[in-house]
Amino acid sequence: MSLANLRNDLPPVPEADDNRHALRDVPHCREAVALMFQVPEEQIAGFVYFWVTKDGMAGTAAVMIGDGLSSPINERFDEVPVPAGMDFHDWQVNGLTATLGKPHQTLDFTFTGERVQVTGHYEAMHPPYAFSSHKDGCPPYYADDRTEQHGIVTGELVIDGRRIALNHFMQRDHSWGPRVWGLNQHYKWFHATTAEACVHFFEMHSFGKVLVRGYVAKDGVMSEITAIDYDFEFDETMHHKTFDVIVTDAAGRKTDVRCKVYAKTQFDADPMIYLKEGATTLTIDGTGGTGWCEFCWNRLYFDFAKDYAALYA
């Protein structure tokens, strides 16, 4: 898939939105970037995550999971103050560096922890999708806006001294504004990537409504999602282990995605919710690739429901 040969049916995202934003002084306001990647041949997956609050406190984390590890890795650096003028063209915070290149096209980054070190160069496969491009905009309790994009990461991953060359799919998420985790009773954050197609959707359950944002990029056209029809299976812990979906977009196409989770973990982001993470191997219309599927659950509901999942789910 080539940026140059892709027709985008969605409005262009301003170049400035690839950089750090001036955050509003409202509760829970923050900016965050998540870089998800999968190395299935090594039975490893992970993500690098960095953020900054409205008060200028910035933190970083890296998570590595999968049967290819002796044990899971969750390395997180404490938040530290950063200058208001420091932006993502030269971001340096506690073990992480990030350097934007061409807006919405390239990003160089490093993460240096005790067990894991990553040196990566990200190149986008398609233009970013902004939630603000949807007719109803971005849910305001989850960001002023957010962009989602798929690409290729090259570089090196080092785990416990073991060196692994990177030339793999990466999913990049960037959001800014309020993040009130607990207002989603449940959500599904889904990414699927092959050399020929990219699919993303975010289905959110909040205030009695179900909201969906997302896109399909394939066959030279990027188009917004209009409907999703999915099915999935749980394991014995009520963690998703398969996920199959038929996605319909505004161009009238149906895209068939079939996923198996090969690495999983729980990421604790907020006291009200659990984030159940799953790195996947998959097919999009029969072509192989990888992706990520995150389920968010209200903790009270999940703790009650998990004992009934085998019987009723």
Locations of the language-model features?
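Structured soluble/peripheral alpha/beta segments that form catalytic or ligand/cofactor-binding pockets
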Residues: 1-313
